[in-house]
């Protein structure tokens, strides 16, 4: 049990083979990328996929804003597909100032995923960034049949409430 002694009875718990809920929502990582693929990582998912949001539609835009730590090139982005047959478009706003800047996005990659999961998408062409430059990554995602296609993090329960997830600026 990776949840420690705080879960169940000192870390032990009973699961019936006839449990109606076990195995209905699982996340499994079957292919891991090399940790040295890229020089830097900018992230806003310190807790990982904890829930989903959307607007009762199968598609949505979401964005995260970052500040470059040095002169560099943005070569890839990573995000979740919450179900099968998901299509996406990835955009970058190289000079982010405020919400209105999101309208100045540039398409840098598009494609589809057959399965749900966490994916790293290489950009068609790397985006040059200057040290301290504020930029945004915008993803438009469409997941047929979904009403909440965007994976999100939040303080879902006692195991996650102690984490500070105010690390950045995000939009849905």
Model-based region annotation:
Residues 99-113:
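Terminal beta-strand-rich extracellular "head" domains
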Residues 110-117, 129:
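Short proline/glycine- and polar residue-rich coil/turn motifs
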Residues 9-10, 116, 158:
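Short edge beta-strand segments in beta-sheet-rich domains
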Residues 17-103, 127-134, 140-172:
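Beta-sheet-rich sandwich/jelly-roll-like modules and their strand-loop junctions
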Residues 1-7, 12:
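Catalytic nucleophile-His microenvironment captured as a short glycine-rich beta-strand/loop
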Residues 118-126:
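Exposed aromatic-hydrophobic patches
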